[in-house]
Amino acid sequence: MNKSSKTVWLTGIGIACLPAALCAKTKVPKPNILFLMCDDMGYGDLACYGQPYIHTPHIDQMAREGMRFTQAYAGSPVSAPSRATLMTGQHTGHTHVRGNREYWRGVPMVQYGQNEDYAIVGQEPYDPQHTILPEMLKDNGYTTGVFGKWAGGYEGSASTPDKRGVDEFYGYICQFQAHLYYPNFLNRYSKAMGDTAVVREVMEQNIQHPMFGKDYFKRKQYSARIIHDKALQWLDRQQDNQPFVGFFTYTLPHAELAQPDDSILENYQKKFFVDKTWGGWEDSRYNAVVHTHAQFAAMITRLDQYVGEIFAKLKEKGLDKNTVVIFTSDNGPHEEGGADPEFFGRD
């Protein structure tokens, strides 16, 4: 459960404001837009807002060089309704998405290797009669991409990315499925690949191992990295003569606390040598965790690394001068899956 819906918005703006008279005489190109939304991170999780334990140099640089919105609030304290307020522009009291209602309850199960998963997954759909952000921007000439968590409709509903103005999608249709960082499948919609609807892309290496227990960590296809790489590949295909908008809705640092055992994690394991463990909660798809503090801190530093890679890609492509980058969280900090906000002094 999230303690607060207060969030942090940072913008890195690569286009200068021009005098009105000059704008009237000169055709100013539409700015590209990247909207980076992480999951269950409070403003107190960032070094630029006083976090003493977690290293976030790239986001800190955004804060120094861009603009901070210190009185910004998320639309809701949980995933689906918070995203609904963003996508619809409605107050949460006006949109009918009021919670993380799951549409997989009672549906048949399908087999993925030795694992069973739901035949249909997702949340309450957005009203198809109400225009949402990707549709609005597409109507204004933008190429649109969404990478990460959707939570705006269930598979086969009237509100999946392919029906809502999105040219390319890769990630989780369902917020509950995103509780597994090593999932059985991810969802995809790509016109370039010939998709006519959202499909499932099976994680063939993952399904060779169980979803729960010690052997779960033998799974190697880490969704956060896979989704981020898909976003970078999409960004690499963009050109300066066609405006684009990308919604990169990262699942980090939402529970479960799981990630590759690499140098990012090892550094925090050394830092928090005396650490906590957590026993897991299978009903919510949270596996048991050791080194909970190190895991959580490493997830945020990993996210920060991804942000740095995005800025590097923009510069490499020569797109950094005409791209607005916005960074925020869907809501405040969480206590799920072994996370310990009190240890980090988080808000």
Model feature map: region roles:
Residues V28-P31, C38-Y53, T70, N100-E102, ...:
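Active-site-proximal cap/lid insertion segments
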